[in-house]
Design a protein with these regions (language model features):
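Short, structured beta-strand-loop surface elements
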Residues: 63-122, 142
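General beta-strand recognition
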Residues: 55-57, 77, 146
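Conserved hydrophobic/aromatic beta-strand scaffold that supports enzyme active sites
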Residues: 22, 42-46, 97-99, 137-139, ...
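Surface loops and adjacent helix of pleckstrin homology
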Residues: 26, 61, 81, 150-152
Length: 170
């Protein structure tokens, strides 16, 4: 039986307590005007964890610019933060940024079915949205991250740390 560090326990508690994340994507490239640097795109997304395929699941509209950007540039980042507490400073607010690779499983595939099951287990109220033609599941495979447990308590985490934190039964 292995001992889980306090930082790993803290990461697990943070991830399991948050249902939304800020999703950052590379903007669509403007190959005509290469001198103009497009700003990164950020959106708030509900997310779920697929423990079978070790992916974070989001459900997004294909009409959204961030979805189109993910299709062109699958490298993404997610940021989850602890909830602010009245009277406490925000500089030591616990947070984790996760870098990953986004992919859209074909509708009806085993990955799609797993994504749908995991997402609806966490967000059953989203079931009607799964029938909308422009919405799709996106699987984000975690690659690495940065966990800030508090002021002066920051560390890099690898994919295995993230997977272990997201799998409470592991």
């Amino acid at each position: 039986m292995s001992h889980e560090s306090r930082l790993q326990q803290s990461l697990r508690q943070l991830l399991l307590s948050q249902r939304t994340a800020a999703l950052a994507v590379q903007p669509l490239a403007d190959f005509i005007n290469v001198s103009a640097l497009p700003a990164p795109q950020i959106s708030m997304v509900p997310w779920a964890w697929d423990a079978e395929f070790f992916t974070l699941i989001i459900h997004v509209s294909g009409l959204a610019s961030h979805t189109q950007a993910m299709e062109q540039h699958p490298a993404v980042s997610l940021l989850m933060t602890a909830t602010e507490q009245t009277g406490q400073g925000v500089h030591a607010l616990e947070r984790v940024s996760i870098q990953g690779v986004a992919s859209t499983p074909p509708e009806g595939s085993v990955l799609w079915q797993g994504a749908r099951k995991a997402y609806l287990a966490r967000f059953p109220e989203a079931e009607p949205m799964t029938a909308l033609g422009d919405f799709r599941f996106v699987c984000i495979t975690p690659q690495s991250g940065r966990h800030v447990a508090g002021f002066g308590a920051a560390r890099d985490v690898d994919a295995q740390d993230l997977i272990a934190a997201l799998n409470p039964a592991a």
